[in-house]
């Protein structure tokens, strides 16, 4: 990491380092190729995948465009069963509420299932600084926690790691014997985590959906860890972004299979659970307290932008990451933010500031694969263009303005264009000397790329000869 580097400089440094690791890139591509095959097979289970996308988009459109109404309906029905709701306008409020609750209840040990919102507000750091013992129970998140790294991908947190690396990590951190078996590595983590479920005083989860009609949250998973995290501790806290709301329970009949298909290439994930409040009288399991923290954290800023509001429809399936040529080459950590890939590049400037994070909008080939892959039809690649436009409109860079002004002058004056075409071979001949001098204005580009040789003859020469020949 570069000390005191801006997000953009850090991004360029991390992206350059990752792209230089060719074996790692090949490993990621192979993993994602397997995902694509499973995804296509699962899509075939739908009578009409495109119709399903339209229907899913309509559900999310209704939820987001009537957000206040549906969130209040959820709160009424959830609190009627003894649950508590806290509205957090920003990350610090959410952290303070959860920290305060843990202190008041004498909590010592906390178990967590996967929640990207907790990564977003740096909840683990805040809890650990206060002396709480925090353990991630999702296998991928647990591995990343042992490595002291953030998730690489918001569905596959440790997809960049090979078995021998995970084995070495477990040997170092957990004292286990080396193993090349995925099953044995999973059992090593399982044995460690089982004890933590039993001793945890608080369980923290996220939610895939908030159901307004029933006042419940929905969690979908493949490991069963979320069920243990939410059922065994006395206190359950769900930290959820406000955009996760959907109007009706029946909506999940479409959204859960869509999420599984787009996210992991499954028809349906293994465990799909609904949570509607603390343990009721006569029930033998479940938490004694259930708190839902509804997190804004600049989501309403994006909601106010009618042009890009549909970015809030995202169901965090990760499909856009899996097909993105940029993500496949630079990896998840290069983005420097909780939400990676194309959708992360759209929403992060809204959440964390356009000028500091505008560079992410340039981390795209604009091929449109992300938009095609999105199960809720978010127009992702056009939103990246909108972010670029808005960044320029908000604060024009004089160097970029000068560059494009010169380009316009060149392209609108035939004599200037012809002169530039004549001088291009000379400029290319001189360029290596300029590179060696350390004063190359194009160094960031030419360090890893070569310009194609200027054509000889030029297109203009060719066209004039063609006309002269009467063709």
Where do the language-model regions lie?
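Residue-level signal for pocket-adjacent positions within structured domains
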Residues: 80, 240, 269, 341, ...
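The feature marks the mature, well-folded catalytic cores of soluble enzymes
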Residues: 1-307
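Short capping/connector residues at structural and topological boundaries
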Residues: 214, 250, 276-280, 340, ...
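Ferredoxin-type iron-sulfur electron-transfer modules in oxidoreductases and energy-metabolism complexes
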Residues: 282-311, 321-322, 326-439
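Intrinsic disorder at enzyme termini
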Residues: 5-35, 45, 403-404, 408-471
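Phosphate-binding glycine-rich loops and their immediate beta-loop-alpha structural context
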Residues: 314
């Amino acid at each position: 990491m570069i000390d005191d580097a801006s997000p953009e400089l850090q991004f360029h440094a991390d992206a350059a380092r990752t792209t230089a690791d060719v074996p790692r890139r090949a490993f990621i591509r192979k993993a994602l190729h397997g995902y694509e095959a499973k995804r296509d097979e699962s899509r075939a289970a739908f009578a009409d995948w495109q119709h399903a996308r339209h229907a899913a988009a309509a559900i999310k459109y209704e939820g987001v465009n009537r957000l206040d109404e549906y969130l209040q309906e959820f709160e009424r029905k959830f609190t009627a069963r003894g649950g508590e709701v806290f509205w957090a306008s920003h990350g610090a409020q959410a952290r303070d509420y959860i920290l305060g609750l843990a202190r008041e209840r004498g909590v010592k040990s906390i178990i967590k299932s996967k929640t990207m919102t907790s990564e977003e507000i740096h909840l683990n750091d805040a809890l650990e600084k206060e002396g709480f013992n925090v353990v991630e129970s999702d296998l991928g998140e647990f591995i990343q926690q042992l490595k002291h790294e953030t998730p690489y991908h918001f569905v596959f947190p440790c997809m960049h790691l090979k078995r021998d690396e995970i084995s070495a990590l477990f040997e170092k951190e957990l004292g286990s014997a080396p193993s090349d078996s995925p099953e044995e590595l999973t059992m090593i983590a399982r044995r460690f985590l089982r004890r933590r479920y039993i001793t945890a005083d608080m369980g923290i989860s996220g939610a895939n959906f908030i159901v307004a009609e029933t006042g419940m949250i929905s969690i979908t998973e493949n490991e069963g860890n979320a069920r243990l995290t939410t059922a065994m501790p006395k206190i359950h806290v769900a930290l959820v972004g406000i955009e996760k709301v959907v109007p009706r329970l029946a909506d999940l009949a479409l959204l859960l299979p869509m999420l599984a298909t787009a996210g992991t290439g499954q028809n349906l994930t293994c465990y799909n659970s609904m949570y509607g409040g603390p343990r009721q009288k006569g029930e033998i399991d479940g938490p004694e307290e259930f708190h839902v923290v509804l997190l804004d954290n600049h989501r309403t800023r994006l909601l106010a932008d009618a042009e890009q509001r549909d970015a809030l429809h995202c169901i965090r399936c990760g499909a856009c990451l899996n097909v993105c040529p940029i993500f496949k080459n630079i990896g998840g950590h290069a983005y420097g933010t909780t939400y990676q890939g194309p959708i992360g590049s759209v929403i992060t400037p809204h959440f964390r500031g356009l000028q500091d994070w505008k560079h992410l909008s340039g981390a795209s080939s604009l091929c449109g694969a992300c938009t095609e892959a999105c199960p809720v039809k978010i127009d992702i690649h056009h939103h990246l263009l909108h972010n670029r436009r808005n960044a320029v409109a908000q604060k024009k860079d004089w160097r970029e303005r000068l560059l494009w002004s010169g380009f316009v002058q060149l392209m609108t004056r035939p004599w200037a264009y012809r002169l530039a075409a004549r001088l291009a071979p000379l400029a290319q001949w001189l360029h290596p000397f300029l590179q060696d001098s350390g004063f190359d204005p194009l160094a960031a580009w030419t360090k890893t790329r070569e310009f194609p040789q200027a054509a000889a003859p030029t297109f203009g020469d060719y066209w004039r000869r063609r006309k002269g020949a009467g063709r």
